Design a protein with these regions (language model features):
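Aromatic/hydrophobic pocket-lining residues that form the small-molecule binding cavity
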Residues: 30, 58, 83, 122, ...
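Conserved C-terminal portion of the radical SAM core fold
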Residues: 40-46, 67-75, 96-97, 102, ...
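Conserved radical SAM core fold
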Residues: 15-16, 52-54, 80-85, 101-117, ...
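Generic structural signal for well-ordered alpha-helices
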Residues: 34, 62, 87, 126, ...
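Accessory C-terminal segments flanking Radical SAM cores
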Residues: 175-248
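Conserved alpha-helical substructure of the radical SAM core
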Residues: 1-73
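Glycine-rich beta-strand-to-loop/alpha-helix junction loops that act as flexible
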Residues: 47-51, 77-79, 249
Length: 249
């Protein structure tokens, strides 16, 4: 479930299938599952979606994961909806990391892509998290043709992280069963961004086994980092150690 209408994901918004009678996992089921994963040695849980904060019991789930399990890290991926209003709650609940989707730093472009004029709320929310000394902030953007795929757009994101200790990652658009036309029209190979980074002296960085599929780059003149998630690269799935559990279990 998501409350945005991103052109590459849910352009018509979330619509419940009347023929699907399956229910979402309850708080009790999620709590029991979290404890089981903890006993099995899982070291990190990421709450994602859709948009995880649309659940009315989201903060109860987050607090339960932090207080009643031995999972060292609990993080989330969010579209940033009302981030400026919930940033303090996220910090108080013990969230260890946050990934925020921002496909454009241009207000009108962001509104066109998502169906929401909320870029200013997200940026304000990031500032609040930083004031709270929240350290693990990442921004994701889907690489899209004629929207954010030019050196000028890359430079805007670079300026955003120049004095911000934030990881900014581009994600190459993936083809799925129901987006073939959109993919053909909007796909941009990740190589275009990688070439830009190499040309501008960004240096590849290696991470540990739990770091995920992002190829990260650092630069001596920047506090933040750039990253690239390229699902069509040769070794994308080679070290995958993730288990994805759907909202219905």
């Amino acid at each position: 479930v998501c409350n945005y209408k991103c052109s590459y994901c849910l352009p018509q918004g979330y619509k419940k299938n009347p023929g699907d009678m399956r229910s979402f996992m309850s708080f009790e089921e999620i709590s029991r599952l979290t404890k089981a994963l903890s006993e099995l040695g899982v070291c990190k849980i990421r709450l994602t979606g859709g948009e995880p904060t649309v659940r009315k019991d989201f903060f109860d789930i987050l607090k339960d994961m932090k207080q009643n399990s031995n999972i060292p890290k609990v993080t989330m991926t969010t579209n940033g909806y009302q981030l400026n209003k919930i940033a303090n709650q996220l910090h108080e609940a013990g969230l260890d990391g946050i990934n925020i989707s921002i496909d454009s730093l241009n207000r009108e472009t962001f509104k066109k892509l998502t169906g929401h004029d909320r870029l200013h709320e997200i940026l304000e929310g990031i500032k609040i998290l930083q004031k709270l000394n929240f350290k693990n902030i990442k921004v994701n953007a889907v690489l899209l043709k004629d929207i954010n795929d030019t050196p000028e757009e890359f430079e805007k994101f670079g300026n955003f992280i120049k004095n911000n200790k934030i990881d900014f990652r581009f994600i190459e658009l993936m083809q799925t069963g129901d987006n073939l036309d959109y993919f053909k029209k909007n796909h941009v190979a990740s190589k275009i961004f990688k070439d830009y980074l190499e040309k501008n002296k960004w240096i590849p960085q290696t991470y540990g086994k739990d770091a995920g599929p992002s190829l990260n780059f650092i630069h001596t003149d920047y506090k933040g980092k750039f990253g690239l998630i390229a699902p069509y690269s040769k070794n994308f799935c080679q070290t995958c150690n993730r288990l994805r559990i759907t909202s219905r279990g």
